[in-house]
């Protein structure tokens, strides 16, 4: 750049005042009259100049791209030599090691990349902001900049004090949110003080003693290297703990195996993309908040200072929350519309007289949603049960109660529907609370029907039609509905002569377990007794259950007789009449997650020797990092394949047959039990194939019809008539043969007994 003419001095954003960084001719200047406040934010040089955080003083003529390109290295240098930024980068580099800690379940490479990105971005933001606050506190008077000796002393005090406080609070960090927050804050101060001390020490050595000019190479690269060294220490400590306490489920890695350069490149890209996205969101929020602050000051005619900044962030936060709520509602509405669509695999109402929507039913086929239609169309027939059990069987009853009407009206409809289907003539009635989308595990329903030899009635009262994550606000209604249905059925059963009265049970899995179990949240097991509930089975009880939390804190308060039993697998359950059996896997994140894990250590993350099986002993609980990993454990809780049962996470298919026998005291011989297990797997695989084939074929025919319509030709069906001079295409012939061999198309939508 030239040297003639008036010159304008550039500035850095270091805390405490204006520091000259470069000097350029005024006609090439973009930013003028800018300074920073005590935490490194842009601020006006005086009252009436620029507003906080806004780029003022745009000069004319507008700079060319070439001039801007010459300024970029200076701006980058200004950014990367800022102590707060450097502390943030060091914290971000260190956070990579905790990001690779083992959780309850393995993560995919793509998920691991997102974990790294979120952790790095979060630790950067927290580290930079905390060090800026420490620097401001050390400087004392606004506008004053602390010297390097004072900053080193501040780093030593905050780092050492934070370390001592963290050590003192650690044993009780899981006792309450107050102690957890204090412990997490102390840990943050300790690591930030250490990082700040390393940054200031490297500054003194590189720039004062050696005399190097500040640059990216003498600042940021050193900081990242120091962060990596801290990460190495974390990994070393983790390995020492593993050797001391042993590896739990050593075959379960933190991340599923990664193969190939392309896979690693994908991970790197996702990591950078995640961090970039979060950073862009933060910058956008900051920019919006500063613009709002300028508007507020124009309206009031006065500078609002920190109050204005705070109000602006509050307004921006409220706006983001409103957008999130609107987006959530859009997702909910879209899901509801999807739930109303009739699937190709289940196109017509059932023909069975013992299921809802059949000839004897009071329920309309389009009123029960996708999962309800699947449920009634997949019911077993007496002959199918006989084929597996080798004993005479009857057709079981399945009733689905739609969510239209009041709770009392739905309870009355449940009784009327059972009457119409012959449910009160069965020996076992189970009120099964579904998940949010209306789903009741098909494996559970079929296992019950096999074990009862068809002499059973399943009632499903629907309280929502959206995935469980979107139905959390419907669980109170679901619990009220469950209790009302149980009470209405119990009253009807009391009118039956004692010798012919069916036994009443309840069942719930996942969110359904929360809904069913929470009937006992007020009144305990005694309330279930008052509703004539003989016993209950609850698979994968979520952490949100009120009854679960009460029972966990004080078991006698809700269950003085000890009839609520918790086991990780059903073969460990005792033989107790009237038992309410909770089966929860040791590695089920749906049960072990907690919103407070952001800072508070959960009970199962205690001393290594006290942790439940399947919980890694070498992993330390860390604020933020452990919470992010737990979120991905939730996402991976239901990774399962049709027909392949495994005791893992939130998948309880492998436990259901035995759990039903233990809780409801149903019987089977070893040979029958094996036959049931085989049939459950075969039917699940068959139905999954049926849905896939029907959906794919339906889409294919729809695409063909669209094309033929454009050609002016008639639409086609699944039948392909062979002509003398035209053979059926080999691919089509193969598809039709596969469907014929497996009898898939013949079973789609079937619900009545075989002809």
Residue ranges of each PLM-predicted region?
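Compositionally biased, low-complexity flexible segments
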Residues: 3-10, 14-18, 39-52
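Serine residues within intrinsically disordered or low-complexity segments
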Residues: 4, 23, 35-38, 60
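Intrinsically disordered, low-complexity N-proximal targeting/linker segments that flank membranes
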Residues: 41-42, 46-80, 84-89, 95
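C-terminal His-loop and adjacent cap/lid subdomain of alpha/beta-hydrolase
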Residues: 77-140, 144-502, 522-755
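Gly/Ala-rich beta-loop-alpha elbow adjacent to hydrolase catalytic centers
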Residues: 508-513
């Amino acid at each position: 750049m030239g040297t003639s003419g008036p010159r304008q001095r550039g500035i850095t954003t270091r805390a405490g005042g204006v520091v000259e960084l470069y000097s350029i001719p005024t006609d090439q200047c973009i930013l003028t009259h800018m300074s920073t406040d005590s935490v490194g934010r842009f601020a006006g040089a005086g009252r009436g100049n620029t507003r906080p955080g806004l780029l003022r003083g745009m000069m004319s003529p507008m700079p060319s791209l070439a001039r801007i390109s010459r300024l970029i290295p200076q701006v980058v240098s200004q950014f990367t030599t800022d102590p707060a930024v450097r502390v943030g980068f060091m914290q971000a580099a260190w956070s990579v090691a905790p990001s690779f800690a083992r959780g309850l379940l393995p993560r995919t490479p793509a998920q691991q990349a997102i974990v790294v990105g979120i952790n790095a971005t979060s630790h950067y933001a927290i580290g930079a902001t905390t060090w800026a606050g420490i620097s401001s506190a050390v400087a004392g008077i606004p506008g004053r900049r602390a010297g390097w000796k004072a900053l080193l002393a501040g780093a030593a005090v905050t780092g050492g004090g934070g370390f001592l406080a963290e050590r003192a609070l650690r044993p009780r960090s899981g006792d309450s949110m107050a102690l957890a927050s204090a412990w997490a804050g102390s840990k943050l101060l300790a690591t930030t003080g250490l990082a700040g001390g390393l940054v200031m020490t490297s500054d003194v050595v590189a720039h004062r003693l050696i005399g190097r000019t500040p640059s990216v190479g003498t600042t940021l690269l050193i900081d990242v290297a120091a962060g990596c060294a801290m990460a190495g220490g974390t990994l070393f400590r983790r390995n020492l703990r593993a050797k001391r306490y042993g590896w739990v489920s050593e075959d379960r890695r933190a991340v599923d195996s990664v193969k190939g350069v392309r896979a690693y490149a994908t991970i790197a890209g996702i990591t950078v993309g995640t961090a970039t996205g979060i950073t862009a969101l933060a910058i956008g929020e900051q920019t919006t908040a500063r613009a709002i602050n300028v508007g507020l000051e124009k309206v009031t005619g006065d500078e609002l200072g920190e109050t204005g900044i705070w109000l602006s962030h509050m307004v921006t936060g409220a706006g983001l929350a409103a957008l999130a709520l609107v987006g959530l509602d859009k997702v909910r509405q879209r899901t509801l519309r999807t739930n109303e669509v009739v699937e190709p695999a289940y196109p017509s109402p059932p023909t069975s007289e013992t299921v809802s929507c059949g000839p004897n039913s009071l329920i309309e086929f389009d009123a029960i949603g996708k999962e309800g239609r699947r449920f009634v169309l997949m019911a077993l027939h007496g002959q199918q049960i006989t084929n597996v059990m080798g004993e005479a069987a009857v057709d079981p009853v399945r009733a689905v109660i739609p969510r239209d009407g009041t709770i009392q009206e739905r309870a009355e409809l449940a009784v009327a529907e059972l009457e119409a289907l012959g449910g009160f003539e069965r020996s076992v009635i189970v009120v099964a609370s579904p998940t949010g989308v209306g789903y009741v595990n098909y494996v559970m329903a079929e296992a019950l029907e096999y074990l009862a030899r068809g002499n059973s009635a399943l009632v499903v009262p629907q309280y929502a039609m959206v995935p469980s994550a979107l139905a959390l606000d419907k669980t109170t209604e679901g619990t009220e509905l469950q209790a009302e249905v149980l009470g209405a059925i119990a009253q009807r059963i009391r009118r039956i002569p004692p010798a012919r009265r069916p036994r009443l049970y309840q069942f719930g899995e996942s969110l359904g377990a929360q809904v069913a179990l929470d009937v006992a949240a007020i009144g305990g097991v005694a309330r279930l007794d008052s509703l004539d509930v003989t016993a209950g089975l609850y698979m994968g009880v979520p952490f949100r259950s009120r009854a679960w939390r009460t029972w966990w804190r004080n078991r006698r308060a809700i269950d003085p007789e000890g009839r609520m039993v918790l086991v990780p697998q059903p073969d460990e359950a005792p033989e107790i009449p009237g038992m309410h059996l909770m089966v929860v896997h040791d590695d089920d994140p749906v049960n072990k997650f907690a919103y407070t894990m952001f800072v508070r250590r959960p009970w199962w993350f205690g001393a290594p020797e006290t942790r439940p099986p399947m919980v890694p002993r070498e992993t330390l609980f860390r604020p933020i990092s452990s919470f992010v990993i737990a979120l991905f454990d939730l996402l991976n809780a239901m990774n399962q394949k049709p027909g392949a049962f495994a005791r893992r996470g939130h998948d309880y298919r492998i436990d259901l047959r035995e759990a039903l026998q233990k809780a409801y005291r149903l019987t089977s011989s070893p040979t029958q039990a094996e036959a049931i297990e085989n049939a459950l797997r075969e039917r699940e695989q068959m139905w999954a194939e049926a849905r896939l084939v029907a959906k794919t074929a339906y889409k294919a025919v729809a695409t063909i019809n669209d094309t033929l319509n454009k050609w002016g030709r008639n639409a086609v069906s699944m039948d392909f008539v062979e002509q003398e001079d035209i053979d059926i295409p080999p691919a089509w012939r193969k598809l039709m043969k596969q469907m014929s061999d497996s009898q898939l198309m013949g079973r789609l939508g079937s619900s009545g007994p075989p002809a």
